[in-house]
């Protein structure tokens, strides 16, 4: 067809015709509706990526209940049955520590204050540092006993020291939980011993963990202690007692900074783990794991996600 036009139109006219034809084809391609369709598709794909739900991923935690949170923003990166209400064991102590540090920041107490151990506090079973009735320790030492060795007796002693009784302290714990939006939590005691009506969820544990580490980063001075001695001072004299951190993740995961373990026959093995990964602060919570080894493994897997 081009030979026909060249022959009958003349060379100059043919060149003009060819130019106009080429230009027409070029602009028809540029302004084709195909571009609009492609853009719409791209926007939809981008939107889907941005709104992707935390559970729509190939990774699955082995723990029955788990959650991974980015601490600075509270963004949930992963969750699995995170609102299931279960006994948390000594992970309860995160709230206890939060109230202790709140009291410190309000100048209600100081780290050098002397705490006297009551009969009730000394009678606590489970994990303890064997405080005796009438024994005195500083607030600083009591925090170490709670954060490192998960001492029930130290928890009750601090609760009584700040608010006069464990019951009054627990009421403050529940009020604080409500203020934080912890919808699946109710505390009966300050140390985490199994009790009817004492429960929380993986999501709520992450919420109170975030509040503690964001508002009171000094907690890491205690949760990163691996081993340390305290001195018992009683009527019988002085004796050394060794504290050993219950959170083995500290020695098994690079960047681990805390936070709190828990285990009872009902709660099984729980852990709220904090760590720094590539300058990002993370909180990983697992509940109802089958063993202490499994909870560490499960938290490490979450933190690696």
Locations of the language-model features?
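Active-site-adjacent loops and short helices of periplasmic peptidoglycan-processing enzymes
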Residues: 36-203, 209-214
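Domain-terminus/edge residues, biased toward the C-terminal soluble/receptor-binding domains
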Residues: 182-186, 190, 194-305
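A generic structural signal for well-ordered coil/turn residues at beta-strand boundaries
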Residues: 21, 111, 244-245
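N-terminal secretory signal peptides that target proteins for export/translocation
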Residues: 1-9
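Domain-scale selection of a single, long terminal region
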Residues: 28-39, 266, 302
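Generic alpha-helix initiation/capping and coil-helix boundary signal
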Residues: 11, 15-17, 170, 292
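Sec-dependent N-terminal signal peptides of Gram-positive bacterial secreted proteins and lipoproteins
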Residues: 14-33
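Residue-level recognition of alpha-helix termini/interfacial anchor residues
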Residues: 8, 12, 215-216
């Amino acid at each position: 067809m081009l030979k026909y036009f060249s022959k009958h139109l003349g060379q100059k006219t043919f060149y003009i015709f060819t130019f106009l034809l080429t230009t027409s084809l070029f602009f028809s391609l540029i302004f084709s509706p195909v571009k609009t369709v492609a853009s719409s598709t791209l926007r939809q794909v981008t939107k889907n990526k941005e709104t992707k739900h935390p559970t729509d991923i190939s990774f699955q935690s082995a723990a029955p209940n788990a959650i991974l949170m980015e601490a600075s923003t509270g963004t949930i990166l992963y969750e699995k049955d995170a609102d299931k209400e279960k006994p948390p064991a000594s992970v309860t102590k995160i709230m206890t520590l939060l109230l202790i540090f709140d009291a410190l920041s309000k100048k209600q107490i100081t780290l050098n204050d002397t705490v006297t151990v009551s009969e009730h506090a000394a009678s606590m079973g489970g994990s303890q540092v064997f405080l005796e009735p009438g024994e005195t320790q500083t607030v600083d030492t009591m925090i170490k006993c709670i954060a490192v060795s998960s001492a029930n007796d130290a928890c009750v002693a601090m609760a009584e020291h700040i608010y006069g009784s464990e019951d009054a302290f627990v009421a403050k714990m529940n009020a604080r939980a409500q203020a934080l939006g912890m919808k699946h939590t109710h505390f009966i005691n300050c140390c985490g011993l199994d009790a009817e009506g004492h429960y929380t969820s993986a999501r709520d544990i992450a919420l109170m963990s975030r509040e503690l580490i964001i508002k009171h980063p000094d907690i890491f001075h205690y949760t990163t202690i691996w081993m340390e001695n305290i001195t018992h001072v009683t009527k019988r004299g002085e004796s050394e007692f060794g504290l050993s951190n219950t959170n083995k993740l500290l020695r098994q995961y690079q960047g681990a900074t805390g936070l709190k373990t828990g285990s009872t026959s009902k709660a099984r093995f729980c852990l709220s783990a904090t760590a720094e990964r590539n300058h990002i602060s993370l909180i990983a919570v697992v509940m109802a794991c089958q063993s202490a080894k499994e909870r560490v493994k499960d938290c490490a897997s979450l933190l690696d996600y």
